[in-house]
Amino acid sequence: MKRKLASVFSVVAIVIASNGYVMAEGDMTEQKPMEIKVQLGDSSNAMRFYPANLEFETGKLYKLVLHNSSGTKHYFSSEGLSRSVFTRKAQVLGPDGKTIAEIKGTIREIEVYPNGTAEWWFVPIKTGVLNDLKCTIKGHAEAGMVGTITIK
């Protein structure tokens, strides 16, 4: 009985160890981020995200660079994206492009002021098509500042 039990535990240990090894594809802390740039509005104050359709893949590190080139502030808001990613950090960049603030924790939306830039570093952990990207300032989504996010 003890031998059978020991054999079962040995097999289970081997299966668990081999599955962990197969699933781990390198050190994720060493990943270089894939940079995706999104422009919020433009110099003519059009209410748009450029591009409006974003695509990500689970397990990859992204640096989402949000730049507002318009004369009014905008929000990048997607509750679905917030729930579908692990956030590493968000950064606020100064006029010279250097980081002036770094935020840790869950990000719900990012407000970017005129001519400002922010970065959101994250790893998607859940697949889906998210149709909730919008600017939450009154009238902006209605004017066309909406988008779709696909996570494969």
Which role does the model predict for each range below?
Residues M1-F9:
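Bacterial N-terminal signal peptides that target proteins for export
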Residues F9-A17:
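Bacterial N-terminal signal peptides
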Residues N19-A24:
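Sec/Tat signal peptide C-region and signal peptidase I cleavage site
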Residues E25, E30, I103-K152:
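Extracellular/periplasmic metallocenter environments
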Residues T29-L61:
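N-terminal edge beta-strand
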Residues A46, G94-T106:
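Short beta-strand and strand-turn-strand segments in soluble, beta-rich domains
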Residues S82-G94:
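Short aromatic-acidic-glycine turn motif
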